[in-house]
Every structure is written in structure tokens, then in C-alpha cells.
Amino acid sequence: MLVSLNVLAAQEPPLPDTFAEHKIVMQISDPNPFKQTLVLNVAGNLVKYYGSTNMDLEIVAFGPGVRLMLEGNVNTPRIKALMATGVRFSACENTLTNFAKILGKKPKLIEGIDIVPAGAARIIQLNEAGYKTLKP
């Protein structure tokens, strides 16, 4: 029975094998649309400043911040544009499970967003791999 439960759990994406000079993880855990927009603004500014080849950036959402990554979000075009530059987005499976309890079904994410078992743990893993955390 444990084996089948593990198969259903979100698989942790592997840590990026990157030679980027700047490794950054950004946290979004706030439901405030202003803060969510700020995270996207900062990400866009970092891409412009460092260039996508000199920087590896992952935006990790957990708690109410996951709303930023839900399908149909007003920021979907901006998220897709950042993805096109190589920015990665990860959403917390724990949060999605809690949303499902409230909504009666799991919400859909914007296509291309990874699901990680625990958003906070993902940030810790990336920190341990040399990433610096930004929380605008």
C-alpha cells in the first residue's frame, strides 16, 4: 500500500544542473495581488539585468501564493513569458491538496508549472544547492 501512495505523491523535480552565475529562488506565499505582481516584476527585472543564460531562477509558491499559478489567473501571459526565458515555476502539492478539500477538486495550474511535494522544503533544497532566496 505504501508503494502505491508514493506513486500518487508529487515527484520532486530534480535540482537544476546549472552553470549559471546567479542562482535565485523567489518565494510567493502571499494572497495579495500587489505582492504577486511584484514577484513577477522582480523576476522580469532580473532576467533583463542578468540575462537568461547568466541566471537560474525558480519561483516557488505555497499557501495562498499558489493562487498566482492557477489556470485563468490574470497574470498567466506574464508567467508564460517568463517561462519562455527559462524561469521555472513550482507550486506546493500540500497547498493544492488543501485547496481541493475546500473546492471539492484540485485546481488546475497554468501549463508548465511544476508541482513539488512541499513548497517550503523546495526552497530549502535550492538554498542547500547554493540558491539565494528573494521574497519581495
Where do the PLM segments sit?
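Secreted/extracellular ectodomain signature
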Residues: L8-P136
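N-terminal signal peptide c-region/cleavage motif recognized by signal peptidases
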Residues: S4-L5
